[in-house]
Structures are given as structure tokens and as C-alpha cells.
């Protein structure tokens, strides 16, 4: 829980130094993207779903959330993932650039029926909210933002978590809790 909160607080605050302590690597282009980010005002209503990672000490974290663009009132839903692993000292860290094996594993998790249900419901809500705000829709189109909230997960989009991260056996709020981040 502390790892995820610190990570997203650092992203929100554009605190590159803190991010370097929480992820396994952060290259100069990532640093620049973080410090120059100006479009998203914030994230809220974060719900985190966790699936077992490739090892006993790793996790695939799916996070559904609402995000607000600067200058617009509409909250758009989105979803993304993080791959979390454990250091030798037992502390958790976020894998900034998952390797091919990890990406393949994440792709397998994206095919899970419950994850698909989460992606589909998020996409339907995104489409509905965007259709109700013509100005925001036009703005996002001008920015080159495609209309797929659900696919942000497949592309590894980053988010801000402002709540606890429960690790669950399955990608469902009702699944057995097996820990917290």
C-alpha cells in the first residue's frame, strides 16, 4: 500500500527523485515526461485489483479510476496496470519497464474473464461520459488521445492512487484478500 501511494504521490507532485527510489529504473525521457506533464489534473475513485505475478513475490496490479483533465469538469474512467515485484530485502518496487516475459504474462492476465469484465465496463462508462461532454471529446481528439480507456491497461498507462491497494486472488472486489501494498 505504501509503495503505491508513494509512487503515485510522486507522479502527481512530479517528484522525480522520489520516483527513482520506488521504481527499478527511470530514464531521462521518463523524467522529462513526468516533469512536463500538464494535461491531467488528478485521479480519484481508485479501485485496485491484483493478480498473482510470475513469481510468489510479484503481482500484476490493475487499477480502475476516474481522471480529470485540466479545465474540464467531467471525470473520465480509465484503467491501467503496474507490475510489482519484491527486492531481496523484502520491500516492494514497481517494474518501470516490464521485460518480454512479464509483458506476455500481463497479456495472459488481460484475457482473464474478470479482467475483461472490468475492461469492458470501464470502456462503456468512458464512452458514455465522453459522449456527454462534447468540448472534452474535441479537446482529447485534438491532443490525439484515442477513445479507449480500457486499452490504457494494455499499454501500461500510469495513474495516481490515493487509496489502499488490496492484493486479491482474482480481479474482483469480492475476491479473497491475500495482502496489501
Show the residue positions of the predicted features.
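A structural detector for beta-sheet-dominated domains
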Residues: 95, 160-162, 170
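SH3/SH3-like (including bacterial SH3b) beta-barrel domains
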Residues: 169-181
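Exposed beta-sheet edge and beta->alpha loop/turn motif
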Residues: 56-140, 149, 180-181
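Second-shell loop/turn segments in exported
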Residues: 5-9, 70, 175
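Short solvent-exposed beta->alpha transition segments
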Residues: 16-65, 69-77
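SH3-family beta-barrel domains
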Residues: 146-166
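Hydrophobic pocket/interface hotspot
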Residues: 7, 18-20, 61, 84, ...
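Core segments of small alpha/beta cavity-forming domains
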Residues: 1-43, 105-153
